[in-house]
Design a protein with these regions (language model features):
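Metal-cofactor-dependent catalytic cores
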Residues: 1-276
């Protein structure tokens, strides 16, 4: 088999909304530049995701020199400008972490509240915000637990071969997609180099109900697919279901689509039970 290559790079500026495909990207300690640097919360500061508000996956972002431009079904276009953000910081909750986050503006709060039909607020990972990966001296954005997620095309193909209705890679929300490797080869990788960056694969990614949300319709699959099928061959002893690998970047640098993926070192892959 020819060398493994990077085939897709995706950043998700707003947690749980649509990703933006990039031809090249700067990788920082927190992951891809701008990835999960915005989060939507309830009025108490608890984060909101597509797990409970699946319509978020239909919110489209475009990056500009001064901020973002947002579009969503039935909503007027919204321009987000960094210079208009408030100077107020408030603690927001992402899982068990409390992060001091910069409140953006009442106008943006109202836009998301109207779209979701739910009172909410919108925050940015400002210069005074700080969060670390658990157990590692490594900065983190509003991502679930790790800065980056990698999945191979072969792994998705192996899953889709078991599904009645194939799913798109977008339902798993990876930052990095690679091709020209065996299915689940990434399970055994420990350190890899892509472009200028060395990555350490620190943990398989446990999957939840969010993977059942169709990225085009914003609706959940009633049969809980593909999670139900994944459970049959990707459930570990801890009863979690895993698909994809969490990464941290060991240095900052640039990567681009077409870069070779160099496997620097390997480790024993997680074991999974298989059920009928």
């Amino acid at each position: 088999m020819s060398s493994t290559i990077l085939t897709n790079v995706t950043t998700y500026p707003i947690k749980s909304t649509q990703g933006i495909s990039l031809n090249n990207a700067l990788v920082k300690e927190t992951g891809l530049e701008l990835d999960r640097h915005f989060v939507i919360t309830d009025l108490n500061g608890k984060f909101i995701t597509g797990r409970t508000k699946s319509a978020l996956v239909l919110v489209n972002s475009n990056i500009t020199a001064t901020g973002l431009i947002l579009n969503a079904p039935g909503m007027p276009e919204l321009r987000i400008t960094y210079n208009n953000f408030s100077n107020k910081y408030q603690n927001v909750q992402v899982w068990n972490d409390e992060i001091s986050a910069q409140h953006c503006s009442n106008e943006i709060d109202q836009w998301f509240s109207m779209y979701l039909n739910f009172s909410c607020r919108f925050y940015y990972l400002g210069e005074h915000s700080h969060r670390e990966v658990k157990g590692l001296d490594h900065k983190l954005s509003f991502a679930d637990g790790y800065p980056l997620l990698l999945i191979s095309e072969a792994s998705l193909e192996a899953l889709n071969a078991k599904l009645e209705h194939p799913v798109a890679m977008a339902q798993f929300r990876p930052n990095l997609v690679v091709s020209q490797c065996l299915e689940f080869a990434e399970d055994g990788w420990h350190k890899i180099r892509i472009g200028e960056v060395v990555f350490e694969i620190v943990k398989p990614c446990s999957r939840c109900i969010f993977t059942t949300v169709n990225e085009i319709t914003g609706k959940r699959n009633k049969q809980k697919e593909p999670l139900s099928t994944l459970k049959k061959f990707r459930q570990a002893k801890d009863k979690e279901i895993y698909f994809g690998q969490n990464l941290i970047a060991l240095n900052e640098g640039s990567i681009k689509v077409g870069d070779k993926v160099e496997i620097i070192s390997k480790h024993p892959p997680q074991e999974y039970s298989v059920s009928n």
